Each structure stands twice: as structure tokens, then as C-alpha cells.
Amino acid sequence: MVRGRFAPSPTGRMHLGNVFAALLSWLSAKSQGGKWLLRIEDIDPQRSHREFAELIMDDLRWLGLEWDEGPYWQSERGDIYEHYLKVLADKGMTYPCYCTRADILATQAPHESDGRVVYKGTCRNLPPDSRRGPAAIRMRVPEEGEGIVTFTDGHYGPQTVDLTSQCGDFIVRRKDGAWAYQLAVVVDDALMGVTEVVRGRDLLLSSPQQIYLAGQLGFRSPHFIHHPLLCNEAGQRLSKRDRSLDMAALRERYAPEEIVGMLARAAGLQATDAPITAADLLPAFSWKKIETADLTF
């Protein structure tokens, strides 16, 4: 059985882009007769707030996007992440990193496409007597040419990524002790039996890192399906800074069926903005109808 999930971070009110991701994830799982899980990714103690999580759940119910399991809270799963971090450490797959953001930026110019900076492995082979102060924990990736990850995205097709040249050794625990996204999401997806991950294409490059990490932990990776982003007329992706498009503002102006209808039209699932419930949209759902280019809303 397909087991999809929606995993929002409670750092603010959901905006239309978040709702789009939730709707597509729900439609994809439910159209296959599957289950849909809700996981609250509240591992950042400085930015996550319980009240935002409660609002997210209220908004999902209001939109007709009911979940079958959860909510699961990442903030309650630290002991589990600790166990799997030790598994990696015992295999010699991790090391402490003392570099600051400024240190890393100074070693290499950002990739022109998205501003990423590939970590050069400065701390990878530091002798023990050089290891002082707070440290992040990084996951080793193979030497260049040996870390090729290939997978087929459910919407964007075959993907090939060289982890060494395109990603570098990545963080699995932050310097402040908080758990990094990559470790938490891989462990949770595996232990929760998630078989399908639907999310925005801005997270496409996270997939090879997660596939590699899952393999090192003996987990089977879910099927990844990335979707185009919703953008404004200037081509900028929608974000939580767009207060006019967050759920507080949208609920004052529209009924849930109107919001679903507008998103369905943007996705190419229907020809107009005609109001429709998420459940009534299920027969029309197909990934083949959705463009790969970002969508203007």
C-alpha cells in the first residue's frame, strides 16, 4: 500500500505554496488507495512553535485534507535519531566539523544556479588534537566519481548526481545540537513506512543525499515525486513572507473549495477556478497533467 506523508515545519502559518504541496501529496496517495501521514518537523527549537503546528492542522482539516496517521512530532524522537547517528559513527561515516558558515563560503563561490556551496571537507581528516569547541557532525560521502547516485523521480524522470562534486559531506547534526533535516527525515520515513514522498522541486537535490544516507543505515528509500513551485508574476516562489497568501488571509477571503479549485487550475487538473473539494478532485488527478515548469499563480 502507498504511504504518503506531509511534513511541514511549524515556523509560521501555511501559505499557498505549502497548501499546494499538501494537496498534491494527499491527492497522489489517496488516488492510489493509500494512506496519508502527518509529521510535524519541529526539530529547530529556535524557529518551531506549537501554536503554528496547531494552526497547520486546523488549516488542513478546513481544506478537507484529513490525515490517516499522526501527527508525529520530530521533537519527541531525539533518542531515535541519536541511535542512528551512533550507527553511522560506528561505521566511520561521520566526523566533527568546526567550520563556520563564513569559513565555508570563503572556500568556494556559490553555484550559479541556486546559491549552494559544496563543502570541501576541510575538517574531514583533522587530527584529534585539532578538534576543539562546538562542532557540527557531517556525513562522509564517497570520493569524487565514486558517489554517483541515480534515481527516477516520479515527475522529473531519471536523475544522476555526484554527491562529492554537487553536494559534499553534509550535516546530520548541527553545531547547536539540533538534529539536521537529512538524518531526521530519512530515519522517520523509514520507520514510519513511508513509500512515497511528494514535495517541491527545490528539494530535488536532497533526494540523492537521503538515498545515500538511507543505504548506509540499511533502509529502503521511498519513491520521490517532486512538483513545480508556485510563483508570483515576477517569477519568485511563494513564501511565508507573502502575508496576503498565508492561510490567515486566505480563509478570510475564500471558502476551502475555492482555494482547492484555484490550485487545481494552476496544476492543470481542471480548466477553470471552479470551486471543488479535494475529494471530488481525486478522479481528475494525474501527474501527467501537471507541468514540470514552475507555475504562475
Predicted regions and their residues:
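Catalytic adenosine-cofactor/nucleotide-binding cores of aminoacyl-tRNA synthetases and other
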Residues: T100, L205-S206, Q216-F297
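N-terminal Rossmann-like or analogous alpha/beta NTP/dinucleotide-binding catalytic cores
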Residues: M1-E112, R201-D202, S206-F219
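Structural motif
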Residues: M14-L16, D176, R253-E258
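Active-site neighborhoods of enzyme catalytic cores
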Residues: H49-Q159, Q166, A274-F297
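Bulky hydrophobic/aromatic packing residues
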Residues: W26, W36, I43, L60, ...
